[in-house]
């Protein structure tokens, strides 16, 4: 898929979004099983583990590929730090901890039909093509 440019390009590729329950939503938004759990911080600062999210069907595979690349990079860094003599289970635990310690498991959301704050334009979250990862770091 060629990367769209501008709102017209985005609408052309992903359609004009609608709220949850709309025909557009039913045809374009899918629930994605994440390759590893991430953490959503609620407004009251409690944390919820997230294992699935809603994303546009056209780019859901790209989301999984990006998250797998993050996991793979973290795994390589962990192996550099602790060596190459651990079990897969031990590496999984250490990789998750490595990501958590760096704030890279924190998640702010995906599909959310809403306008950009201070604007009349819809957020890219309305299309299901945006994810907020490590929102406290950016």
Listing of model-derived features with the role each one plays in the protein:
Residues 4, 24, 101, 121-123:
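Homeobox/homeodomain signature
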Residues 1, 45, 104-109:
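Auxiliary tRNA-acceptor-end handling modules of aminoacyl-tRNA synthetases
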Residues 1-17:
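N-terminal low-complexity, Pro/Thr/Ser-rich intrinsically disordered segments
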Residues 98-103, 126, 135-137:
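Flexible, surface-exposed loop/gating regions in the mature catalytic domains
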Residues 110-135:
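Short, surface-exposed glycine/acidic/tryptophan-bearing loops
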Residues 14-103:
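Active-site acidic/histidine clusters and adjacent loop/turn architecture
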Residues 29, 105, 109-114:
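Aromatic-residue hotspot detector
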């Amino acid at each position: 898929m060629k990367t769209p440019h501008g709102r017209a390009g985005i609408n052309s590729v992903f359609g004009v979004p609608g709220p949850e329950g709309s025909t557009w939503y039913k045809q374009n938004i899918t629930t994605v099983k994440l390759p590893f759990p991430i953490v959503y911080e609620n407004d009251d600062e409690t944390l919820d583990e997230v294992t699935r999210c809603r994303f546009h069907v056209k780019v859901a595979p790209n989301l999984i590929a990006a998250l797998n690349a993050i996991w793979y990079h973290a795994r390589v860094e962990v192996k550099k730090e602790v060596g190459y003599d651990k079990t897969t289970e031990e590496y999984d635990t250490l990789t998750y901890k490595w990501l958590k310690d760096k704030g890279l498991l924190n998640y702010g959301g995906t599909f959310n039909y809403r306008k950009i704050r201070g604007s009349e334009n819809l957020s890219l979250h309305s299309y299901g093509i945006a994810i907020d990862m490590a929102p406290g770091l950016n």
